[in-house]
Amino acid sequence: MVKNSSVRTRKRVKKQITDGIAHIHASFNNTIVTITDRQGNALGWATSGGSGFRGSRKSTPFAAQIAAERCAEIVKDYGIKNLEVMVKGPGPGRESTIRALNAAGFRITNITDVTPIPHNGCRPPKKRRV
């Protein structure tokens, strides 16, 4: 007779981290918020589109604020208190995301703009004629 042995998976222990980095990618169409530790390992992320906004509502500052609140909710178990913010892109969700992270209880120590600027690299897209 074979005994039924239950397979136990080890419960993942969330390590306590005090300092983190918030990467905000604010494009014209969407806003992506990722919170990592100092080494760059992602702890949690959220997007405007994943927060229930679709189409042109994805690219609003309010959608970026909701995405930042959801990301803060995901990583609060890690015990992060201080955040360094890296903002990339020209989108409308740049400032509202930082305000939402501040309101979520994080102490923002540093804000850095890491938007890539070409030294006359690729040709930009043609201007829209509407």
Curated annotation (Swiss-Prot):
Question: What are its GO biological-process terms?
Answer: translation
Pfam families recorded = Ribosomal_S11
Is Oxidoreductase included in the keywords of this UniProt record? no
The Swiss-Prot or TrEMBL record annotates one GO molecular function as:
rRNA binding
Keyword set, alphabetical order: Ribonucleoprotein, Ribosomal protein, RNA-binding, rRNA-binding
Q: What PROSITE patterns does the entry give?
A: RIBOSOMAL_S11
Q: Name one GO cellular component term.
A: ribosome
Family note: Belongs to the universal ribosomal protein uS11 family.
PANTHER family under this entry? 40S RIBOSOMAL PROTEIN S14/30S RIBOSOMAL PROTEIN S11
Function, as annotated, reads: Located on the platform of the 30S subunit, it bridges several disparate RNA helices of the 16S rRNA. Forms part of the Shine-Dalgarno cleft in the 70S ribosome.
Note the subunit structure: Part of the 30S ribosomal subunit. Interacts with proteins S7 and S18. Binds to IF-3.
Q: What is this protein called?
A: Small ribosomal subunit protein uS11
Q: Which organism is it from?
A: Buchnera aphidicola subsp. Schizaphis graminum (strain Sg)
